[in-house]
Amino acid sequence: MNKELQPKVIFLMGPTASGKTALALELAEKHNCEIISVDSALIYRGMDIGSAKPSADELARGPHRLIDIRDPRESYSAADFRADAIAEIELIVSMGKTPVLVGGTMMYFKALLEGLSPLPSADEAIRAEIQAEADEKGWEALHDQLREIDPVSAERIHPNDPQRLSRALEVYRISGKSMTELTQTKSAPLPYEVVQFAIAPRERKVLHDLIAQRFAIMLKQGFLEEVTELKARGDLHLDLPSMRCVGYRQCWQYLDGEFDYDTMVEKAVAATRQLAKRQLTWLRSWPELNWLESGAEGNLVTLMRQCR
């Protein structure tokens, strides 16, 4: 189908604390749009404060799809997101509305836009088997195994990166094919006309200050109490993707007595700034992107003009 005849989908991307949610809510209220969250932290139930999840009032103004869909103990892959997001997009389009995908998890946006390689789902038994081998022989020995079966991935993955190394070995043991071989085939790209926007402050210092201010507000709202409740469950740990989210790890370590309160704040803010830096690095190389300045008047008008 000709792109101009396809239904429109809006991507609203940006670093953390850049004002994406506020602009998305304006879109939902003033135009015929529905919001889909593209955020790997917002998917988790019980992780509200530290993930800057939209408030009850904000959700009443503009409901967000794909938030609170997983327990923090559960995994959620880019492939899971792509399948869920496509289903939500199809539903919104069938209602005669425009989907607005809002967030900062660039890997999810990329998977949705370009498709994914047909990699097998995680297998906990094989993953445990690989971990046991690593405990016995060391990750260097497993990296040697990877070099034999998939030299391209071995060149790309460092021996001190156990998560990616384990995944590459897991893929081979499940499928009998290397990750390099499988990634040469991708699923079909998104069958819609996608109009893409990024929002960020013009000055880096402004973003850094916003991040520090927002973390201070999170602490006043009870972020430490939220992490205390998560720890008290007894089934969560710092190796889970949910607990690796910025802020959560540092609060957890503080509660474990690894460092004092001021150090926790410093580390959490620094980690969030690093996340924002990575997000901006992705966006600077993103093709066909329309840039908006955080807090600028007329962003909504500019966005809608570009979407015509």
From Swiss-Prot:
Listed EC numbers: 2.5.1.75
Binding site for substrate: T16, A17, S18, G19, K20, T21
UniProt KW keywords: ATP-binding, Magnesium, Nucleotide-binding, Transferase, tRNA processing
Reactions mediated catalytically: adenosine(37) in tRNA + dimethylallyl diphosphate = N(6)-dimethylallyladenosine(37) in tRNA + diphosphate
InterPro entries named in the record: Dimethylallyltransferase, IPT, P-loop_NTPase
Annotated positions binding ATP: G14, P15, T16, A17, S18, G19, K20, T21
GO terms classed as biological process: tRNA modification
Annotated GO MF terms: ATP binding; tRNA dimethylallyltransferase activity
Keyword field contains Transferase: yes
Listed cofactors: Mg(2+)
Record flagged with keyword Lipid biosynthesis: no
Positions marked as site (Interaction with substrate tRNA): T105, R127
Region (Interaction with substrate tRNA): 39-42, 163-167, 244-249
Listed Pfam families: IPPT (PF01715)
Record text on subunit structure and interactions: Monomer.
Known function: Catalyzes the transfer of a dimethylallyl group onto the adenine at position 37 in tRNAs that read codons beginning with uridine, leading to the formation of N6-(dimethylallyl)adenosine (i(6)A).
Family statement drawn from the similarity comment of this UniProt entry: Belongs to the IPP transferase family.
Protein's name in the database: tRNA dimethylallyltransferase
Organism: Shewanella baltica (strain OS223)
